[in-house]
């Protein structure tokens, strides 16, 4: 088959991908270097005493321990639900809908974005499972482009959805340091808090009509872009062309009654009623929280999201044995979070305790106006996200000065959380950190898909700057 001739934009993306893979280190060295850089700024620029800086860093290392566990559960829970047999069967039926390669890539892109809005962990794995099913069914489908579409939810709308880290942190008590809550609260006439407790519920972030409009625009634009760049005919390289085996491994998640366990303890592990009962209790607890909340949006926190995923995992996998195996398969994907989040906690503590956040807020205030502040933060968030590829931990670093400057510019604080999220997601299109779990499942390398994701980023980045500017102008202060 003739090798397809790439366009100028594709050639540029491939060159940039090769440079990034050759010269940029993994995410962990960035966290280590970031620790040293912030410590140096705290000591040199802010004049913080070395003993105080050391104590601040040491205390901050474990400040994100609850959040680290919650984010790990997002990854595990999303994976467990996406790989459950009933979901897998539904995915196979969905893969039977498209008839052409272009229809298949657009379907996968839309599925990735919409499912990632509900949960980024589920969306990432769900889209990957769908991509493999599509590649088996649709002839002449370019596997590289198809694989890249599985990442588009994480590169566009995920942070504007129900698992958006920054929005959930702002809405969940105890998920941010008290110093950050104080900054978010602000001070009004007479010293009263402008935002009580510094808590910003989801109705003021992801459920703003402006946020929902931004999500809808991104989905439409990206779907149209994917349709336009999908290689057809001789330009396409299928999974077979790339030497990738799409056959499914034997499914060992189903219990076989005829050779089931005999001892009582093992018998209990394979009883479907037990898992279904616990799953039902979990879903009932979530519904109770939603019913009792003053606003439904205010009740959707990391805890409720994770409880929902856990309950669905029990219900869909039925028996405790099946669920345990699903969790065991999903757990390795969380090691990066558990390793890096303590470092980010230490960085955040140094930034706030040294008043470095106030210095950066001064810079952002001086460099922007109320109209230009949102696009400035979106661009800065995207740039920093290339080097710190974690929306939640990066928000801990950015929140102090982003929110402080928002008060000074008198812009909507909830919208600035959404602005941060929209910018942060773009970074996932240009660096491979969050691509790794999916690429392993699809049998590809980062360089195989980043030409497509870079192409999407070139369109999405200016679109985001336009959206945050135009939609932000319709909102008042403080919420």
Regions found by a protein language model. Give the residues of each.
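Membrane-interfacial loop-to-helix junctions in multi-pass transporters
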Residues: 26, 62-68, 95-107, 137-146, ...
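Membrane-core helix-loop-helix motifs of multi-pass transport proteins
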Residues: 130-237, 435-467
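C-terminal transmembrane helix pair
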Residues: 133, 137-154, 368-479
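Helix-loop-helix module between adjacent transmembrane segments
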Residues: 74-82, 107-123, 144-161, 214, ...
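Hydrophobic alpha-helical transmembrane segments of multi-pass integral membrane proteins
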Residues: 97-130, 338-354, 365-404
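Flexible loop linkers connecting adjacent transmembrane helices
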Residues: 12-16, 52-57, 82-98, 129-143, ...
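Cytoplasmic juxtamembrane regions at transmembrane-helix boundaries
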Residues: 85-107, 231-253, 413
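Hydrophobic transmembrane alpha-helices of multi-pass small-molecule transporters
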Residues: 1-76, 199, 206-336, 340, ...
């Amino acid at each position: 088959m003739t090798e397809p001739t790439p366009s100028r934009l594709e050639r540029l993306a491939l060159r940039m991908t090769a440079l990034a893979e050759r010269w940029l280190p993994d995410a962990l060295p960035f966290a280590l270097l970031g620790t040293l850089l912030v410590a140096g700024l705290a000591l040199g620029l802010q004049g913080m005493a070395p003993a105080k800086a050391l104590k601040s860093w040491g205390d901050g290392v474990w400040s994100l321990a609850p959040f680290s566990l919650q984010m790990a559960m997002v990854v595990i829970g999303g994976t467990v639900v996406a790989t459950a047999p009933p979901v897998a069967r539904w995915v196979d039926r969905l893969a039977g809908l498209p008839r052409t390669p272009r229809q298949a890539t657009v379907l996968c892109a839309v599925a990735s974005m919409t499912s990632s809005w509900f949960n980024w962990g589920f969306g990432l794995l769900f889209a990957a499972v769908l991509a493999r099913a599509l590649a088996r069914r649709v002839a002449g489908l370019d596997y590289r482009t198809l694989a890249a579409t599985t990442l588009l939810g994480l590169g566009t709308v995920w942070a504007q959805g129900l698992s958006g880290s920054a929005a959930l942190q702002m809405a969940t008590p105890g998920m941010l340091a008290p110093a950050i809550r104080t900054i978010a609260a602000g001070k009004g006439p007479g010293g009263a808090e402008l935002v009580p407790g510094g808590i910003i519920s989801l109705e003021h972030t992801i459920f703003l009509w402006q946020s929902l409009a931004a999500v809808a625009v991104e989905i439409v634009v990206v779907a149209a872009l994917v349709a336009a760049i999908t290689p057809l005919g001789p330009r396409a390289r299928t999974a077979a062309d790339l030497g990738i085996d799409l056959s499914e491994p034997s499914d060992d998640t189903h219990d076989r009654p005829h050779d089931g366990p005999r001892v009582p303890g093992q018998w209990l592990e394979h009883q479907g009623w037990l898992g279904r009962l616990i799953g039902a209790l979990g879903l009932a607890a979530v519904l109770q929280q939603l019913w009792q909340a003053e606003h439904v949006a205010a009740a959707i926190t990391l805890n409720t999201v994770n409880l929902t995923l856990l309950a669905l995992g029990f219900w869909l996998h039925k028996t405790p044995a099946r669920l345990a195996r699903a969790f065991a398969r999903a757990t390795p994907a969380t090691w990066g979070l558990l390793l890096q989040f303590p470092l980010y906690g230490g960085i955040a503590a140094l930034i706030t305790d040294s008043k470095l956040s106030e210095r950066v807020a001064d810079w952002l205030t001086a460099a922007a106006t109320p109209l230009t502040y949102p696009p400035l933060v979106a661009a800065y968030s995207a740039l920093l996200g290339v080097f710190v590829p974690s929306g939640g931990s990066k928000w801990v670093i950015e929140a102090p000065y982003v929110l402080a400057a928002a008060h000074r510019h008198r812009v909507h604080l909830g919208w600035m959380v959404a602005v941060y999220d929209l910018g942060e997601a773009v970074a996932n299109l240009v660096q491979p950190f969050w691509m790794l779990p999916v690429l392993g499942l699809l049998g590809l390398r980062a360089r195989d898909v980043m030409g497509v994701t870079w192409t999407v980023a070139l369109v999405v980045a200016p679109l985001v700057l336009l959206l945050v500017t135009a939609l932000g102008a319709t909102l008042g202060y403080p919420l």
